[in-house]
Amino acid sequence: MIKLNHINKTYPNGFVALKNIDLEVAKGDIMGIIGYSGAGKSTLIRIINRLEEPTSGTLFVDGVNMLGLKQKELQMQRQKIGMIFQHFNLLSARNVFDNVAFALEIAKWDKKAIKPRVDELLELVGLSERASFFPSQLSGGQKQRVAIARALANHPKVLLCDEATSALDTKTTKSILALLRDIQRRLGLSVVLITHQIEVVREICNKMCVVSDGAIVERGSVAEVFAAPKHPITRELISFLPQDEGHIISHLKDLHNVYKVIFTGPYAHLPLVSQMIREFDVDVNILSGNIDELATGEVGHLVLKFIATDDKRDKALSWLKEQGVSIEDLNLMCQNTDSIQLSQKIESKAV
């Protein structure tokens, strides 16, 4: 549905916002693009509907070469791409009905067709009873629902969400995400969602990529990335070790024989550790554990300290891997993290 190849963006002042971006979003995907402020996320999503122009690269949406379109053709194609923003962008002098109708007026819909379409959209987002309300009379969540209805007005195939929940409280965020998920399923939309909130990715997305310093540093299914984040930025964003685990590990004098065991999908609820203990006659201390509920399933984490010979431990770990479980040696991982931090300190001093 959406395909970007070798996309670069350099501004006239020389600032490089995007570096060789390759990204593909399939029909029906909810792709979460996450990163810290200034990473290039918003530039990337604005290139998809050409609110920003790339310096180089190719961009296709629904098989159409977006960069080869003239202005009138671009306007027609943009009707297939809905977009919602952090700050709603509603017209204060228009009521809810007229804010949604505005998108249809711009697209030159027949006047007789506008009312039934707006009524349909307001029912979809749960605002039928507030059609005559003005933006000043709405809560933040209600304003975003109006913005969603407006973005869907022209039957788009793609929905772009630029920090759509970052101005909302936690409860309202959950309701908006539930609405977006329901709409995506009903309409079969492809959704690209920009956020710095990992909870948003966990709640709604099936795919994700991590952007840092203008480049995609990690990508994959949400379950894969949450289970085994590889890049240091990803680990920071998803809190690779929850606070309780980090606290426990920081107080361990010796990380030898300490492993993180990651269970995904159906494995999250199987008694594999107890089976392993019986099968291989090993003693194990469970230092911490948790289960993350994702939009596509669950990911469970246990931090285990083995009290066993190296041979028994290795056989037990091999058996766990054969059951579909991922294993991470925290001793080795902490050593690698220390090396990265040391390199960063050396580089910063050199600068």
From Swiss-Prot:
Residues annotated as binding ATP: G35, Y36, S37, G38, A39, G40, K41, S42
Membrane topology: Peripheral membrane protein
Keyword Transport belongs to the record: yes
GO molecular function annotations of the record: ABC-type D-methionine transporter activity; ATP binding; ATP hydrolysis activity
Translocase among keywords: yes
Annotated SMART domains: AAA, NIL
InterPro entries: AAA+_ATPase, ABC_transporter-like_ATP-bd, ABC_transporter-like_CS, ACT-like_dom_sf, MetN_ABC, MetN_ABC_transporter-like, NIL_domain, P-loop_NTPase
Class of the enzyme per the UniProt entry, highest EC level: translocase
Predominant location: membrane
Pfam families in UniProt: ABC_tran, NIL
CDD domains per the UniProt record, alphabetical: ABC_MetN_methionine_transporter
Record-annotated ABC transporter domain positions: 2-238
Localization per record: Cell inner membrane
Catalytic activity, EC: 7.4.2.11
Reaction catalyzed: L-methionine(out) + ATP + H2O = L-methionine(in) + ADP + phosphate + H(+); D-methionine(out) + ATP + H2O = D-methionine(in) + ADP + phosphate + H(+)
Keyword list, A-Z: Amino-acid transport, ATP-binding, Cell inner membrane, Cell membrane, Membrane, Nucleotide-binding, Translocase, Transport
GO cellular component term of the entry, any: plasma membrane
Quaternary data: The complex is composed of two ATP-binding proteins (MetN), two transmembrane proteins (MetI) and a solute-binding protein (MetQ).
Family (UniProt): Belongs to the ABC transporter superfamily. Methionine importer (TC 3.A.1.24) family.
Function summary: Part of the ABC transporter complex MetNIQ involved in methionine import. Responsible for energy coupling to the transport system.
Protein's UniProt name: Methionine import ATP-binding protein MetN
